Amino acid sequence: MELVIKDVPSLLSVSEIIFGRDFNEALIHQVVVAYSASTRQGTRAQKSRADVSGSGRKPWRQKGTGRARAGSFRSPIWRSGGVTFASKPQSHSQKINKKMYRGALKSIFSELIRQKRLIIFEKFSLDLPKTNLLVKKLKEIKLNNVLILTKEIENNLFLASRNLYSVDVKDVCSMDPVSLIAFEHIIITVAALKKVEEMLS
């Protein structure tokens, strides 16, 4: 299949097997959920009755006081006692094998091409790391909510985009399924697209 290059009047030939896949919503959903779960810190922690500091002595004898029986100062029903079902640090990561991950990326790129959300440039860079230069460049092509993918990180582009909420710059090795779905348009250079094709083949 052939794709149009925006800044140069020519076509780029790419693999139909990689960029002509059907939209597999279930697979993409599974991969996106797994990716999002793996970014969770999972470091929250609370103290159970075993972790709270305090005496292990029985507060008062079992019978004869007229008060409700009590066995510990650290009981969850007492003030300053432990939490009943205390949270502990845990990993939320889910296993996704390489074949599934690559399949999801192929499906996402194929859908981006079908929806004309993938815009290819021969070269996309800035002479200076200035935010207003990037804003002006994006206004010229009438785009605002954009992920810019390059073969290797363009320092000027990266620095210019840091203050823009709706623009992100990544190199191909750092791309992820969540970012590819989240942005309205993806700007990608020819070199980056060839690298994506090589990675997914």
From Swiss-Prot:
GO terms for biological process: translation. Pfam families: Ribosomal_L4. Residues 44-68 are annotated as: Disordered. GO terms for molecular function: rRNA binding; structural constituent of ribosome. One of its GO terms (cellular component) is ribosome. Keywords: Ribonucleoprotein, Ribosomal protein, RNA-binding, rRNA-binding. PANTHER family: 50S RIBOSOMAL PROTEIN L4 (PTHR10746), LARGE RIBOSOMAL SUBUNIT PROTEIN UL4M (PTHR10746:SF6). Part of the 50S ribosomal subunit. Belongs to the universal ribosomal protein uL4 family. One of the primary rRNA binding proteins, this protein initially binds near the 5'-end of the 23S rRNA. It is important during the early stages of 50S assembly. It makes multiple contacts with different domains of the 23S rRNA in the assembled 50S subunit and ribosome. Forms part of the polypeptide exit tunnel. This is Large ribosomal subunit protein uL4. It comes from Buchnera aphidicola subsp. Schizaphis graminum (strain Sg). The lineage of its organism: Bacteria, Pseudomonadati, Pseudomonadota, Gammaproteobacteria, Enterobacterales. The gene is rplD.
